Amino acid sequence: MGVKKEKGRKRFRKRKTFGNQILPLELLIEKNKREIINSAELMEEIYMKIDEKHTQCVTK
């Protein structure tokens, strides 16, 4: 008869962690459309960011 091999300690596979990923602006806007539309302050912030990006692209 064969001898049973001793099983070692099971090791858990680490889940892949993706740090704090920054979602692209467009995706954020898609996810939070209702909140943004209802909030004038958020709308202003987004327009400011879009303007900043646009001016950066134009100057490059």
Curated annotation (Swiss-Prot):
Signal peptide: none annotated. This is Transcriptional regulatory protein SenN. The keyword Transmembrane does not apply. Keywords: DNA-binding, Transcription, Transcription regulation. Regulates the expression of extracellular-protein genes of Bacillus natto. The gene is senN. To B.subtilis SenS. The keyword Transcription applies. It comes from the Bacteria. It holds the Pfam family Fur_reg_FbpB. Residues 11-31 bind DNA. GO terms for molecular function: DNA binding. InterPro entries: SenN/SenS (IPR025004).
